[in-house]
């Protein structure tokens, strides 16, 4: 799918998100080797946590801060609601008991995939068609700046 240069940093993170969703789903369904995902539940939880810490939190903030004001109200609500649910599910996986962790990881993987597809197929094309080039350029510049900061923060945290 063709994506405007300005939104490519978010699309790149969506690619990472789809890989994590795929790995978690395969691992939880008993096929971890096919996706390179951890075989045990603690490893699967660690994968979700790493993704949350290194990508998801900053990604959520960037989308809501930079795109939210340009979207239709229903899309802004859905964006915020699904982001909150993704973070809630990672929290359950991180802090819950084993049965809850498995269920939360499964729900997280399914929602993550659905959410990314919605953004890439509907939300981003809408934004690209309704936001002028100058604003998209401003958004793209801010995304690049945030991406550099997020990578720097992730390196210093590890």
Set out the residue ranges of the language-model regions:
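Small-residue-biased structural context
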Residues: 1-158
